[in-house]
Amino acid sequence: MPKICQITKKKSMLGQNRSHAMNATKKKFSLNIQYHTFWLPEKKKKIRIRITKKGIRMINKFGISKIYKKYII
């Protein structure tokens, strides 16, 4: 399963490590993805989603009901 946030749709990025001599080696920047369970009061059930820390902050700000309707459905 790819590391993609279900709310923000962010993916991991590719970049380069640079040494002191400016030699470039490829690097993958991974996301802070976690599984999190939320309770939906309208549907009276729990949902489990893969979400980044920024997505959790969005849910705390706007509420799970609004985010669920806008991004997940």
UniProtKB/Swiss-Prot annotation:
Q: Return the SUPFAM superfamilies for the record.
A: L28p-like
Report keywords, A-Z.
Ribonucleoprotein, Ribosomal protein
| GO cellular component term, pick one | ribosome
Top-rank lineage group of the source organism: Bacteria
Pfam family, any one: Ribosomal_L28
A single GO BP term for this record reads: translation
| InterPro entries, alphabetized | Ribosomal_bL28, Ribosomal_bL28/bL31-like_sf, Ribosomal_bL28_bact-type, Ribosomal_bL28_sf
* Entry annotated with the keyword Zinc: no
Q: Does the keyword Ribosomal protein apply?
A: yes
Q: Which GO molecular function entries does the Swiss-Prot or TrEMBL record give? A: structural constituent of ribosome
Q: Provide the family line.
A: Belongs to the bacterial ribosomal protein bL28 family.
Official protein name in the record:
Large ribosomal subunit protein bL28
Q: Which organism is it from?
A: Buchnera aphidicola subsp. Cinara cedri (strain Cc)
